[in-house]
């Protein structure tokens, strides 16, 4: 349920709903931003992504869950560019404590 709420919020560029899912000490890692620590800093980075694109669609191909972790195989479309990747999310007490994103980024 939490994972699905995150996916919907991300697709809707709903930074307030995303914020409600993140722990204060949330850590975001991905190939672009590298490593960001803290909810506020991560939300700022996510906001920049949202503002930089007109059209964004995040589609989960498969979701794997256990007690405290989720793995999402996904396709992310940003302004007509399609990226495939995997998000590994760690949860604690109903909040996301870490998200590690692995993307197949096209070479220029």
Predicted regions mapped to residue ranges:
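Short, well-ordered alpha-helical segments enriched in acidic and aromatic residues
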Residues: 2, 12-25
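Amphipathic alpha-helical repeat scaffolds
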Residues: 4-8
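A beta-strand edge to alpha-helix "cap/lid" segment located at domain peripheries
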Residues: 11, 29, 43-108
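A short gly/proline-enriched turn/hairpin at secondary-structure junctions
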Residues: 27-37
């Amino acid at each position: 349920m939490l994972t699905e709420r995150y996916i919907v919020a991300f697709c809707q560029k709903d930074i307030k709903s995303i914020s409600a899912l993140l722990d204060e000490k949330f850590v975001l890692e991905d190939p672009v931003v590298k490593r960001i620590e803290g909810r506020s800093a991560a939300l700022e980075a996510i906001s920049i992504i949202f503002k930089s694109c007109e059209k964004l669609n995040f589609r989960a191909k498969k979701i794997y869950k256990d007690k405290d972790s989720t793995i999402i195989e996904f396709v992310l479309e940003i302004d007509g560019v399609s990226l495939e990747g995997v998000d590994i999310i760690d949860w604690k007490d109903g909040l996301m404590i870490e998200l590690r994103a692995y993307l197949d980024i096209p070479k220029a």
